[in-house]
Regions:
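Acidic, proline/glycine-rich low-complexity intrinsically disordered segments
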Residues: 1-319, 339, 391
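Glycine-centered helix-boundary capping/hinge motifs
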Residues: 25-27, 365, 411
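Short, ordered coil/turn segments that flank beta-strands lining enzyme active or ligand-binding pockets
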Residues: 52-54, 363, 401
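Helix-coil-helix junctions within alpha-helical repeat/solenoid scaffolds
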Residues: 284-289, 294-375
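TPR/TPR-like (Sel1-like) alpha-helical repeat modules
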Residues: 315, 375-382, 411
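Short arginine-rich
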Residues: 354, 382-384, 413
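Right-handed beta-helix
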Residues: 379, 383-391
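Terminal, low-structured helical/coil segments at or just beyond the last alpha-helical repeat
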Residues: 388-413
Length: 413
């Protein structure tokens, strides 16, 4: 049984699209729909299962209860629906475990997940506060610890926390989640992400990712495993994992982003263009796709395209550190060294990752400053430092003994 990720399923929320069209876009055989009504004397929940091939109504049921314990009602309904789906498919349904018995903790957790999925620095910080409040109500709430771990990793990528701060907090929270619930696959995945990005211990991390996936971890874990495989030069395995991630979450551009880097490490330009097109198809105005289009264009000396995309980012996302980075890259592509240096100075003022500064210096052929910034990236345990073995931006300085020493330092040689 394959269930698509939340982000892809929620892409259709409230849009009233035909179930057959949804089935085609998500590549699923059936769609489960539901509604919730609070009435004066209780609660009514209606669920229906429709076949996507022809819209045929497979099953429906209404659940009515006067119980005030919403968590108990949720567990009962979830187990009932799971059993019915398994009856239609054939086979026994696994019992669905209630993550907490404390209604206040559960409500705070749901608020935290809402903030988490808004994907902004401020909302992610708010999510951490809400998850911590949930834990205060129920210290055994493993999923709330998982929420903290995932949020801390995102805050590192958003440059709101240093790698040292964020990854250590993420590991601590994920380890607590695993201690409370050893079968929580995504918690093992967060351990893998934090440990690989910070400790560079591939053998241990590989086991953690594989454990996570064996327990049914979601798309972010599979993406992270695919990314880690790419940094080790295991490109075929990386592509396989990232394509599975795309099947799990077909409406998200994130798997295509990670596969772009895999193609980039392979110097496969056609593959990179394909991933750019896929990101644009899914979210035409997604800044991640636009920034990577600059990366590809600069590497291919397509400076006019790089300038156009960088200017778009500058207009729409001027405060994003990545925007200043691509503006510097585009200036370097055009041969405008003073402008590139000005943008690099702005990147530093905004607290951009040292790895991005190193790319800027490499593009203006400043070998010493590029290697100096790469050393700072390694000192800070930035996740991007694991790109150095295959990153095309550094081909010009790859043979420098100082560069080779950095590869050895982070465990890539």
């Amino acid at each position: 049984l394959r269930v698509v990720a939340r982000t892809s399923a929620f892409a259709f929320k409230g849009k009233g699209e035909d179930v057959r069209e949804i089935g085609q876009q998500l590549n699923v055989d059936a769609v489960l729909e539901g509604s919730f009504t609070r009435e004066s004397d209780g609660i009514r929940i209606t669920a229906q299962l429709n076949r996507t091939a022809d819209g045929y109504h497979l099953w429906s049921h209404s659940y009515e209860t006067q119980s005030k314990d919403l968590l108990a009602v949720q567990a009962d309904v979830a187990n009932s629906i799971s059993a019915e789906i398994q009856r239609i498919r054939g086979g026994a349904a696994p019992a669905i475990r209630t993550p907490t018995t404390n209604p206040e903790a559960h409500d705070l957790y749901l608020q935290g997940m809402y903030q988490f999925y808004r994907h902004t620095p401020d909302s992610t910080l708010r999510a951490v506060d809400l998850f911590e409040a949930a834990i205060a109500k129920d210290p055994s709430f493993a999923r709330a610890y998982l929420g903290i771990g995932r949020s801390e990793i995102n805050l590192v990528s958003m440059t709101r926390l240093t790698a040292d701060e964020g990854y250590s907090r993420a590991r601590e929270a994920a380890q607590r989640a695993v201690d409370l619930d050893p079968n929580l696959g995504d918690a093992w995945g967060v351990l893998g992400m934090a440990n690989y990005s910070y400790d560079w211990n591939w053998d241990r991390v590989k086991e953690q990712f594989q454990k996570a996936l064996s327990l049914g971890a979601g798309t972010p874990t599979r993406e992270a495993y695919g990314w880690s495989l790419a940094t080790r030069g295991r490109f075929a395995e990386a592509h396989a994992q990232l394509r599975l991630a795309a099947e799990q979450d077909p409406m998200s551009p994130a798997p295509a982003l990670n596969e772009f880097f895999t193609y980039n490490f392979e110097r496969n330009v056609a593959g990179q263009r394909k991933m750019i097109a896929e990101m644009m198809r899914l979210q035409p105005d997604w800044v991640g796709g636009r920034l990577l289009h600059v990366v590809l264009s600069v590497q291919q000396k397509e400076c006019a395209t790089a300038r156009s995309e960088a200017d778009w980012a500058g207009k729409n996302y001027p405060k994003l550190p990545g925007t200043q980075a691509v503006l510097a890259f585009a200036a370097a592509c055009e041969g405008d060294r003073p402008e590139a240096l000005r943008r690099i100075a702005e990147m530093k003022a905004m607290g951009a990752p040292a790895y991005q500064l190193a790319i800027g210096y490499a593009l203006i052929h400043d070998r010493d400053h590029a290697i100096e910034e790469l050393g700072k990236s390694a000192d800070a345990h930035e996740g991007q430092i694991l790109y150095i073995k295959y990153d095309p931006f550094f081909d010009e300085i790859r043979s420098d003994p100082r560069y080779v020493a950095l590869e050895k330092r982070v465990g890539l040689l």
